[in-house]
Amino acid sequence: MSGGLDILSLKEDDITKMLVATTHLGSENVNFQMEQYVFKRRADGVNIINLGKTWEKLVLAARAIVAIENASDVFVISSRPIGQRAVLKFAKYTDTTPIAGRFTPGAFTNQIQPAFREPRLLVVTDPNTDHQPIMEASYVNIPVIAFTNTDSPLRYIDIAIPCNNKSPHSIGLMWWLLAREVLRLRGTISRTTEWPVVVDLFFYRDPEEAEKEEAAAAKELLPPPKVEEAVDHPVEETTNWADEVAAETVGGGVEDWNEDTVKTSWGSDGQF
């Protein structure tokens, strides 16, 4: 599919990324139409996908996307949560139209409803979960590109990209590779330089883990608590106030109110 050109061949760096993201690991079951993409079957029953054919189909899919004059007529779809972030990032960098989450039935066939759309090309994450848009696309003759596992059905799919579509890292990497190849074919980025967008942006993030990471990052930004230094205060000498009162009493400094020399008679005669 790459036409035998070295410039379109699979690079060692991309192969390493695919192996790390487990893109080559399929499921234990094999659809009879996907047997041509299976390289080998392991002893534990897992089928190994031929990454050479994966890259050839990815380049073919990128050429089909670039052939559409208006990029917004290309719809990228993912009903599964693990592919929704990758779909949104792909649409951001390639100017395509994303549908992340639940697909509205009749969006391609029912012209009365407000959500009616007329795309020229579909790219779906999983034929099993995205069966509704694939079925509706077959009614109105819309070509479909799909990331398919070894057990995925290929009915109504025009270009199948064999890969592990059940792993969040594998799905994110495949959308990233497809976006990079589309931009290279358009001439937006060069093949000789590295694309500055990292693949981590396309990976699915668990909301709970994201909240924990944000909380930990916010905690690191907080200033450390102030530690008060110990201050040595001078110790005052204790005074025995009882001794001072006793000394004043002995010295005669206290008046005796019982020895009053003035006598007063409260009688009516006024005499003492």
Swiss-Prot record:
Keywords: Cytoplasm, Developmental protein, Nucleus, Ribonucleoprotein, Ribosomal protein
Listed Polar residues bias regions: 263-272
Pfam families: 40S_SA_C, Ribosomal_S2
Region of interest called Disordered, as start-end residue ranges on this chain: 250-272
Molecular-function annotations in GO: ribosome binding; structural constituent of ribosome
Compartments where located: Cytoplasm; Nucleus
GO biological process, one term: translation
Any one Gene Ontology cellular component term annotated for this protein: nucleus
Coiled coil: none
Family: Belongs to the universal ribosomal protein uS2 family.
Subunit structure and binding partners: Component of the small ribosomal subunit. Mature ribosomes consist of a small (40S) and a large (60S) subunit. The 40S subunit contains about 33 different proteins and 1 molecule of RNA (18S). The 60S subunit contains about 49 different proteins and 3 molecules of RNA (28S, 5.8S and 5S). Interacts with oho23B/rpS21.
Role of this protein: Required for the assembly and/or stability of the 40S ribosomal subunit. Required for the processing of the 20S rRNA-precursor to mature 18S rRNA in a late step of the maturation of 40S ribosomal subunits. Required during oogenesis and imaginal development.
UniProt protein name: Small ribosomal subunit protein uS2
Organism: Drosophila grimshawi (Hawaiian fruit fly)
